[in-house]
């Protein structure tokens, strides 16, 4: 399992407040059933928030998630 740091995510979304909102919205989408956009191993038992941060750090999700609204 790769470690995700806030610094990795801040490279994609420089504003901490927007990063928090984007991660929260995306985590809610994943919780409701949206498919994660990053590769997950079967042994990974990451929470939706960690998956959302992985997606942001990988550049798969950005501020556009805020424009889509909640799921």
Swiss-Prot record:
Subunit details: The RNAP catalytic core consists of 2 alpha, 1 beta, 1 beta' and 1 omega subunit. When a sigma factor is associated with the core the holoenzyme is formed, which can initiate transcription.
Class of enzymatic activity (EC top level): transferase
Protein name: DNA-directed RNA polymerase subunit omega
Cited function: Promotes RNA polymerase assembly. Latches the N- and C-terminal regions of the beta' subunit thereby facilitating its interaction with the beta and alpha subunits.
Organism field: Aromatoleum aromaticum (strain DSM 19018 / LMG 30748 / EbN1)
PANTHER family the record matches: DNA-DIRECTED RNA POLYMERASE SUBUNIT OMEGA (PTHR34476:SF1)
One Gene Ontology term from the biological process aspect of the record: DNA-templated transcription
Gene that encodes the chain: rpoZ
EC number: 2.7.7.6
Keywords: DNA-directed RNA polymerase, Nucleotidyltransferase, Transcription, Transferase
Superkingdom, natural source: Bacteria
